[in-house]
């Protein structure tokens, strides 16, 4: 805005009635001050002066606040400022807030309007430079300037009262509504038209827009030039680029790393690059380039249909390659570089982004008219001289490296350029054919193979004339929907494919780590035990390689281990005996080795089957276990009828109660240390005539059995019978043993062994086998295997330590003690341990969860705990404990 306008504004502001000394009303202050800011006289004048092309428009400061510009500039004038006193009015603060809000809204409106005006002015300057260089200044300049002058006059006439804020050469324009020629195309048209109808109509419109600009120089060319063979190729370059500048800016634009994608984006990129070279500020030219492109795209769209007739008439008159043919094929075949495509994607033009999406989806309908136009220049190029062909090729080579493929006869270096451009192309669906080799760019035969899949939508095989239009076409719709100006990484994978690959690899690594950790855990456990055991003279062997069955955790409590697994008795004991048969030197002392071991092996298997039957609660297995009992042991069963009344009187309810709290009770086998005479037990073996066991002694053992485990009852029954009768036979012992297990299978509850553990059953043969002396302390069954051998140092395999009381007695293993009665060997008392450790495989931490459920812990109340304590104390007080062991009994 000129200085005269600023002076008139300030004079009107200071001479208003608001500044008289007689007015003290605050409402009058606000009203007169507001009216003084709206200057009706200078609106049209300042708008017309700002429309004139001036270089200072681009340098204005848009970000300064409105209030500073309105008050600060008026205060920065002459000495007239001293007459303004704004501190006495109480309404100035409220008025300042209102004006600040309204000025912000007006500033947003004026920025949009000034962007449009500056883009029109800049486009006008470009058009003038272009017309002066190509010698048709009169036609184009007159047409374009007339359109812009009419638009500027419409803006000046239809604009409302404006607020002149600062005194520079720029002006803030606040239009109430956009001009009529801008509103429908800029905002409404892209939103109304659907996508399904878009491709065909949009392609024809877009093609005529480009042809219309390129036909104007063709009409001028007919009237002025006679021999226009070389001039047509020379003129095609300026229409492609809009500025006839030398090669340095074009080489900057057509970097081999850059690929153009759309005709309109390429066209405005050229002009912006030329302006960047000529103008001083690169940043301002780039921003103006975005705004100019948005307004120029719909100004060219007005009258497409009459221009089509001019193009056809021009081609028929000349019968030669017109500039529109070359420029049409060049612009549609070129691809937008991804860096420049990001600039165009970030533009504020809604219509431009909508048009880019339409052009991208309508590449296939555009191919067919391009091929028809392409055949004409190829036929005419053959008639030209060699010098003219080379000249045209050199002109075109400075502008677009992609045009070098049209001239097959000229030795142009296109290998590096096209390959580098092709590497940055988005991935098409026929990636396997494109990646076949590096020679596919040079040889036309491989380009035929490459373009077969691209031309399927046109139902037309690729010919020699349409290599340019097919070779660098847009990507397929599957990839173009993701290609919105952003660089996809990795290049040849979709985002969904990358996510699926990442999740798949993560799942595989998790599974493999879980398997390896479980296996390494078990191996490391075995190796650790082996190292410790070998240092103490023991050896560890795996029980079996049979895979354990998966536990059913829903049907068993968390504390039950026996309920979740089954015995691998056939493999375990066969491996155990075969291993000991080859390495145990104590087996060599046995005279009859095969017979007793086979019988004892069968007997051990029957014991394990019995445990398995009690766990699984199968009636069929009960009968099988009873059938599996060895035949030589069936003779002592004749006296079972005498002992049927023993367990018939047992209190089954008491047994079930004991088994219910079996996990809390340690009955303590070591506490049952009966003070028996050693001479009586040795004399019992000396007597050869068996004596029957009395019924009263059997009843004693039966009553004791109801309050203890079955192992304890059998052991106590043996010791009672030995102490009372003095001697017994092996048949009676076997008879009592078989009687115990048959009564367990018939009358004892199946849940009796719910809380037993594996370690106790592994040591079961030690408990049920008859001992030579009742005074021998029994092995503690509740201790695990690893604790049982802790601190033992055997010199070699299968040798055992002798009890301190009997240091000179021979040594036997536990399994050989099963056959000592058959061998009739005289052995003294002693505790024997095997140096072989059998490591049974259990469930890992990932397969079996030992943590109890939270609901179980929450159900335990103080009253329930007190009841459990009283019941356990009562149960312990009712036990038959030796008098010497009473002091060791623990009560809760």
From Swiss-Prot:
Residues 208-223, 357-371, 624-643, 707-719 have a biased composition (Basic and acidic residues). The modification Phosphoserine is found at residues 43, 133, 281, 364, 394, 476, 500, 503, 618, 746, 825. It comes from the Eukaryota. The keyword Phosphoprotein applies. Disruption phenotype: CHS3 abnormally localized to vacuole. Residues 346-356 have a biased composition (Low complexity). Keywords: Phosphoprotein. Residues 185-287, 305-387, 506-526, 618-644, 685-734 are annotated as: Disordered. May interact with CHS3 and seems to be an adapter (along with SKT5) to link CHS3 to septins. This is Protein BNI4. It comes from Saccharomyces cerevisiae (strain ATCC 204508 / S288c). The lineage of its organism: Eukaryota, Fungi, Dikarya, Ascomycota, Saccharomycotina. The gene is BNI4.
């Amino acid at each position: 805005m000129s200085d005269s306008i600023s002076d008139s504004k300030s004079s009107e502001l200071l001479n208003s009635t608001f500044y008289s000394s007689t007015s003290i009303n605050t409402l009058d202050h606000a009203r007169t001050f507001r009216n003084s800011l709206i200057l009706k006289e200078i609106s049209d004048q300042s708008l017309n002066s700002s429309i004139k092309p001036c270089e200072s428009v681009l340098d204005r400061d848009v970000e300064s606040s409105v209030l500073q510009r309105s008050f600060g500039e008026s205060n920065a004038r002459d000495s007239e400022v001293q007459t303004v006193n704004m501190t006495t009015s109480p309404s100035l603060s409220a008025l300042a807030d209102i004006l600040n809000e309204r000025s912000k809204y007006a500033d947003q409106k004026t920025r949009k309007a000034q962007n449009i005006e500056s883009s029109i002015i800049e486009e006008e300057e470009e058009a003038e430079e272009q017309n002066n260089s190509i010698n048709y200044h009169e036609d184009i300049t007159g047409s374009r300037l007339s359109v812009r002058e009419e638009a500027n006059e419409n803006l000046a006439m239809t604009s409302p009262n404006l607020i002149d804020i600062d005194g520079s050469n720029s002006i803030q324009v606040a239009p109430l509504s956009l001009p009529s020629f801008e509103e429908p195309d800029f905002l409404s048209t892209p939103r109304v038209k659907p996508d399904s109808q878009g491709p065909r109509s949009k392609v024809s419109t877009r093609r005529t827009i480009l042809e219309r600009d390129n036909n104007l120089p063709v009409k001028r060319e007919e009237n002025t030039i006679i021999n226009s063979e070389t001039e047509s190729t020379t003129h095609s370059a300026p229409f492609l680029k809009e500025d006839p500048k030398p090669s340095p800016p074009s080489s900057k634009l057509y970097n081999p790393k850059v690929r153009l994608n759309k005709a309109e984006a390429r066209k405005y990129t050229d002009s912006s690059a030329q302006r960047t070279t000529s103008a001083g500020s690169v940043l301002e030219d780039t921003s103006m380039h975005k705004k100019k492109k948005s307004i120029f795209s719909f100004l060219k769209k007005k009258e497409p249909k009459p221009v089509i007739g001019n193009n056809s008439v021009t081609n028929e008159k000349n019968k030669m390659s017109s500039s529109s043919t070359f420029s049409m094929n060049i612009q549609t075949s070129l691809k937008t570089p991804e860096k420049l495509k990001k600039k165009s994607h970030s533009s504020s033009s809604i219509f431009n982004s909508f048009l880019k999406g339409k052009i991208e989806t309508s590449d296939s309908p555009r191919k067919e008219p391009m091929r028809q136009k392409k055949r004409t220049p190829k036929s005419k190029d053959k008639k030209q001289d060699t010098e003219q062909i080379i000249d045209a090729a050199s002109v075109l080579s400075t502008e677009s490296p992609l045009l070098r493929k049209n001239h097959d006869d000229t030795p142009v270096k296109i290998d590096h350029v096209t390959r580098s451009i092709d590497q940055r192309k988005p991935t098409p669906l026929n990636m396997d054919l494109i990646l076949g080799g590096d020679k596919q760019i040079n040889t036309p035969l491989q380009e035929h193979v490459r373009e077969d899949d691209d031309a399927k939508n046109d139902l037309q095989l690729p010919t020699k004339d349409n290599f340019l239009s097919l070779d660098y076409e847009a990507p397929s719709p599957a990839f173009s929907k993701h290609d919105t100006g952003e660089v996809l990484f990795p290049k040849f994978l979709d985002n969904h494919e990358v996510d699926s690959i990442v999740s798949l690899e993560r799942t595989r690594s998790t599974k493999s780590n879980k398997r390896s950790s479980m296996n390494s855990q078990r191996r490391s456990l075995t190796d650790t035990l082996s190292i410790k055991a070998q240092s103490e003279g023991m050896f560890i062997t795996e029980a079996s390689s049979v895979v354990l069955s998966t536990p059913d955790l829903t049907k068993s409590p968390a504390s039950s281990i026996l309920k979740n697994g089954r015995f691998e008795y056939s493999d375990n004991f066969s491996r155990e005996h075969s291993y000991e048969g080859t390495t145990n030197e104590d087996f060599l002392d046995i005279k009859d080795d095969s017979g007793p071991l086979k019988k004892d092996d069968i007997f051990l298997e029957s014991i394990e089957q019995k445990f398995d039957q009690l766990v699984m609660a199968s009636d069929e297995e009960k009968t099988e276990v009873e059938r599996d009992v060895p035949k030589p042991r069936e003779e002592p069963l004749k006296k079972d009828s005498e002992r049927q009344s023993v367990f018939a009187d047992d209190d089954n309810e008491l047994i079930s109660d004991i088994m219910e709290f079996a996990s809390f009770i340690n009955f303590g086998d070591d506490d049952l240390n009966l003070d028996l005479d050693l001479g009586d037990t040795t004399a019992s073996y000396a007597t050869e005539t068996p004596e029957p066991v009395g019924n009263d002694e059997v009843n004693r053992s039966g009553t004791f059995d109801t309050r203890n485990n079955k192992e304890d009852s059998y052991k106590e029954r043996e010791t009672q019978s030995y102490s009372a009768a003095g001697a017994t036979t092996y048949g009676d012992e076997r008879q009592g043993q078989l009687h115990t297990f048959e009564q367990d299978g018939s009358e004892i509850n199946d849940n009796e062994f719910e809380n037993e553990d594996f370690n106790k059953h592994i040591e079961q043969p030690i408990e049920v086998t008859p001992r030579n002396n009742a005074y021998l302390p029994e092995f503690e069954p509740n201790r695990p295997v690893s604790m049982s051998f802790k601190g033992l140092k055997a010199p070699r395999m299968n040798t055992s330590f002798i009890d301190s009381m009997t240091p000179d007695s021979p040594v036997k293993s536990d399994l050989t003690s099963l056959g000592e009665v058959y061998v009739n060997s005289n052995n003294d008392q002693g505790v024997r341990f095997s140096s072989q450790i059998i490591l049974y495989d259990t469930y890992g931490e990932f397969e079996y969860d030992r943590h109890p459920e939270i609901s179980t812990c929450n159900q335990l109340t103080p009253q329930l705990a007190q009841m459990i304590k009283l019941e356990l104390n009562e149960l312990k007080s009712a036990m038959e404990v030796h008098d010497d062991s009473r002091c060791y009994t623990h009560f809760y």
